[in-house]
């Protein structure tokens, strides 16, 4: 079971890293617009609605970010995972706490 989560975490991180590298600088899809880390979350391409666990692909990163569901997430990576789980219904709202 642990190996399964390690593989899933690695896959999610690779998807987000790949998206970060392919995005054009200054594109509006970056979450958040300012901060230590910005990601381009592929919520239109990747569906994780079947996944009901909480995963932090960026452990140790504290960069509060508010989602459109008015929940504060510890960092953009966690928000992206929640966005993938919701099929894109939860997205970036603003930087900082809600």
From Swiss-Prot:
Record-annotated Kazal-like domain positions: 35-98
Q: Which residues bear sugar attachments?
A: 52
- CDD domains associated with the record: KAZAL_PSTI
Q: Cite the PANTHER family for this sequence.
A: SERINE PROTEASE INHIBITOR KAZAL-TYPE 14, SERINE PROTEASE INHIBITOR KAZAL-TYPE 7 SPINK7
Taxonomy of origin reads: Eukaryota, Metazoa, Chordata, Craniata, Vertebrata
Q: What is this protein called?
A: Serine protease inhibitor Kazal-type 14
Keyword annotations of the record: Disulfide bond, Glycoprotein, Hydrolase, Protease inhibitor, Secreted, Serine protease inhibitor, Signal
Cysteines engaged in disulfide bonds, as pairs: 41-80, 58-77, 66-98
Swiss-Prot/TrEMBL site (Reactive bond) positions: 60-61
Q: Note the InterPro entries from the entry.
A: Kazal-type_SerProtInhib, Kazal_dom, Kazal_dom_sf
Q: Tell me the superkingdom of the source.
A: Eukaryota
**Pfam families the record matches:** Kazal_1
Tell me, what does this protein do in biology? Answer: May be a serine protease inhibitor.
Organism from which the protein derives: Rattus norvegicus (Rat)
Q: What is the residue range of the signal peptide feature?
A: 1-23
Q: Tell me where it resides.
A: Secreted
Q: Which PROSITE patterns match?
A: KAZAL_1, KAZAL_2
Signal among keywords: yes
Gene Ontology terms: cellular component: extracellular region
GO molecular function terms listed in the Swiss-Prot or TrEMBL record: hydrolase activity; serine-type endopeptidase inhibitor activity
